[in-house]
Amino acid sequence: MTDIAVAEQTTKLIGPGRLVLVVGPSGAGKDTLINAARTLCADDPAIVFARRVVTREASAAEDNLQVTPDDFSRLEAAGDFALHWRAHGHAYGLPRGLDDDIRAGRTVVANVSRMVIDPARSAYANVVVVLITAPAEVLAARIAARARASDGSITDRVGRSVAAHPDVTISNVGDPIAHARDLLEIIRHGRPQP
């Protein structure tokens, strides 16, 4: 069972900045592309990469803040998350501070569950959803290679299907730097550039 929530909102959508939601199946390489895009635009103060708060151990490729389930529940109850969800037995949240960045006109990039897309579109004025994907056999090989205990069954993770309704899809097979450049163009412009 997955729980999702968006912070209570007023009738006005949060903007004028952009919220770029990077979604996709386990093993698609979301963190790889996000980290490479972050490096490519490190000198751009208009782009902010959200740091997720999670109740599982972060891998070397992730820039997450690990907390206990009790601490997460306290943060959640205090309203400290802009978006939060539960999936695969863990809780995930994006700090409320990202709202201030978006109000200031910055672009915020976040790796999220596909299940928070609709709540995010209901809360923010400018949301771009980027689906990172790869063929099933590539996903399975990547999940097996990282051997993260929290991944559970590889078959279940690869077979999981949640509609994303993306604005843009990147098939992450081949050169990850080229795909990171594609992602950066979307981050900067809200869509791929010709």
Curated annotation (Swiss-Prot):
EC numbers: 2.7.4.23
Reactions the enzyme catalyzes: alpha-D-ribose 1,5-bisphosphate + ATP = 5-phospho-alpha-D-ribose 1-diphosphate + ADP
Residues involved in ATP binding: G24, P25, S26, G27, A28, G29, K30, D31
Gene3D superfamilies the record matches: P-loop containing nucleotide triphosphate hydrolases
Pfam families in the record: AAA_33 (PF13671)
Domain of life of the source: Bacteria
Keywords assigned: ATP-binding, Nucleotide-binding, Transferase
Disulfide bonds: none
Pathway recorded for this protein: Metabolic intermediate biosynthesis; 5-phospho-alpha-D-ribose 1-diphosphate biosynthesis; 5-phospho-alpha-D-ribose 1-diphosphate from D-ribose 5-phosphate (route II): step 3/3
A molecular function (GO) term: ATP binding
Gene Ontology terms describing biological process: 5-phosphoribose 1-diphosphate biosynthetic process; organic phosphonate metabolic process
UniProt similarity note: Belongs to the ribose 1,5-bisphosphokinase family.
Listed NCBIfam families: phosphon_PhnN
Reported function: Catalyzes the phosphorylation of ribose 1,5-bisphosphate to 5-phospho-D-ribosyl alpha-1-diphosphate (PRPP).
Protein name: Ribose 1,5-bisphosphate phosphokinase PhnN
Biological source species: Rhodopseudomonas palustris (strain ATCC BAA-98 / CGA009)
Organism placement in taxonomy: Bacteria, Pseudomonadati, Pseudomonadota, Alphaproteobacteria, Hyphomicrobiales
